Amino acid sequence: MSVILGIDPGSRVTGYGVIRQQGRHLIYLGSGCIRTSDLELPLRLKQIYAGVSEIITQFQPDAFAIEQVFMAKNADSALKLGQARGSAIVAAVNAELPVYEYAARLIKQAVVGTGAADKSQVQHMVQQMLKLPGKPQADAADALGVAICHANTNKTLIALAGQATSARRGRYR
């Protein structure tokens, strides 16, 4: 049983989603958005750090998963996104959480089945997978998608490790 915090970083809106992985089941614990004010970037980064730190304190996750930076058309936007990611990652590292990063296409593939999915498809599938009563906010749904991607990746790695151990045992008997 592990608790996973997923983050969809942004300099103005950072989505978060928290799930518990119990065997093959994923249980929704919470989600939302950290909305920064129209202050200068350094103060927004401070708000992201404080918000993520508060979420970590509230939910006590075992793992921290975050979406990787994609190449934006606007270099300034990509740099600000990278700084927002950095603020969130520092909060996780300060809490001594392991940090995992996933590409947006991999997250969409894990949640929807195609890396080219749009936001509404991710929202719909997150709602279905976690049995939510309504559609989550877009940024929160993306963050829950990051957490789901990590849970699925983690399950696959554990299964592969178990198969490798079984194969080794069989071979050396």
Curated annotation (Swiss-Prot):
Main location: cytoplasm
Chain sites annotated for binding Mg(2+) 1: D8, D139
The reaction(s) this protein catalyses: Endonucleolytic cleavage at a junction such as a reciprocal single-stranded crossover between two homologous DNA duplexes (Holliday junction)
Localization annotation: Cytoplasm
GO molecular function, one term: crossover junction DNA endonuclease activity
GO biological process, one term: DNA recombination
Alphabetized Gene3D superfamilies for the sequence: Ribonuclease H-like superfamily/Ribonuclease H
A single cellular component GO annotation: Holliday junction resolvase complex
Stored InterPro entries: RNaseH-like_sf, RNaseH_sf, X-over_junc_endoDNase_Mg_BS, X-over_junc_endoDNase_RuvC
Residues reported in the UniProt entry to bind Mg(2+) 2: E67
EC number annotated for this UniProt entry: 3.1.21.10
Keyword vocabulary terms for this entry: Cytoplasm, DNA damage, DNA recombination, DNA repair, DNA-binding, Endonuclease, Hydrolase, Magnesium, Metal-binding, Nuclease
Cofactor-binding details, from the entry: Binds 2 Mg(2+) ion per subunit.
Pfam short name (any one): RuvC
SUPFAM superfamilies xrefs: Ribonuclease H-like
Cofactor entry: Mg(2+)
Catalytic site: D8, E67, D139
Uppermost EC category: hydrolase
Similarity field: Belongs to the RuvC family.
Its job: The RuvA-RuvB-RuvC complex processes Holliday junction (HJ) DNA during genetic recombination and DNA repair. Endonuclease that resolves HJ intermediates. Cleaves cruciform DNA by making single-stranded nicks across the HJ at symmetrical positions within the homologous arms, yielding a 5'-phosphate and a 3'-hydroxyl group; requires a central core of homology in the junction. The consensus cleavage sequence is 5'-(A/T)TT(C/G)-3'. Cleavage occurs on the 3'-side of the TT dinucleotide at the point of strand exchange.
Subunit structure: Homodimer which binds Holliday junction (HJ) DNA. The HJ becomes 2-fold symmetrical on binding to RuvC with unstacked arms; it has a different conformation from HJ DNA in complex with RuvA. In the full resolvosome a probable DNA-RuvA(4)-RuvB(12)-RuvC(2) complex forms which resolves the HJ.
Protein name: Crossover junction endodeoxyribonuclease RuvC
